[in-house]
């Protein structure tokens, strides 16, 4: 598996060309003089029902797993007891630069070192992506590693830890799932370690909450302009945002769906994400008002949400 680092310039139409850069970090609703020509172009390409690759404009499962582990601090560690029964207990954990879980345990582990660490990340009450790390649990190798892992724990939790209570899970493979009751994708250890967590991970939730609170008109407009729909949208909310785009939850009389809308180009920080959103909002408004043509490919893939605790209207909020 190759990590996804390329731009989508070859796959998408030209990216937004702002006459004047947007300096503000707030989300704005731009309204232009319809008599003035515009040069802004935003691209939304049709996605395919395939694993996460460049064609789906989504991060690879390895990247998603790394982001989940970076954002989370608690999980369920399952090991085999001395009598052979599986036992799962809640644990706190940190991760090192390669994504290796670092645990603090007050008990000795089973002679059978096989273990699984299951971690979930709720996204704005609408979706719960998760990953399960399979590997061998054991003590760090030497004093140098111990000191480094102690520093990792201290940075994560702001507290000192007894070095003799530190354990690590040597990652063998990772099962990544987008939500409850969905099929997972296995990620190789090398892909997981070489992947980078999403650059927006620490700010994504705040951005999404701002949009859902203040830009609902824009989100409805995105559904109508950028997505090829043949039904009326009753309600919609943004689920999550990453460097390649964002996911929307759409409620309708026909059912509940998730849809992926890509950014015109990859973003790497808060300013880039908000500028891209504002540019897409402006273009959608002008297309809706017939001030410019819808000169882009609409998203055609909608993923129906079934059997999820988050699928009811309002997302449990």
From Swiss-Prot:
GO terms for cellular component: chloroplast; chloroplast stroma; chloroplast thylakoid; protein-containing complex. Keywords: Chlorophyll biosynthesis, Chloroplast, Heme biosynthesis, Plastid, Transit peptide. It is found in: Plastid, Chloroplast stroma. Disruption phenotype: Reduced growth, slightly pale green leaves, reduced levels of chlorophyll and heme, and low non-photochemical quenching (NPQ). GO terms for biological process: chlorophyll biosynthetic process; heme biosynthetic process; photosynthetic electron transport chain; positive regulation of heme biosynthetic process; post-embryonic development; tetrapyrrole biosynthetic process. GO terms for molecular function: protein-membrane adaptor activity. The keyword Secreted does not apply. Residues 1-42 form a transit peptide. It comes from the Eukaryota. Its main location: plastid. Pfam families: DUF2470. Interacts with HEMA1 and forms a heterotetramer of two GLUTRBP and two HEMA1 subunits. Involved in the regulation of glutamyl-tRNA reductase (GluTR) which is important for the synthesis and distribution of 5-aminolevulinate, a precursor in heme and chlorophyll biosynthesis. Stimulates GluTR activity and regulates glutamate-1-semialdehyde release. May play a role in heme metabolism. Necessary for efficient photosynthetic electron transport in chloroplasts. This is Glutamyl-tRNA reductase-binding protein, chloroplastic. It comes from Arabidopsis thaliana (Mouse-ear cress). The lineage of its organism: Eukaryota, Viridiplantae, Streptophyta, Embryophyta, Tracheophyta.
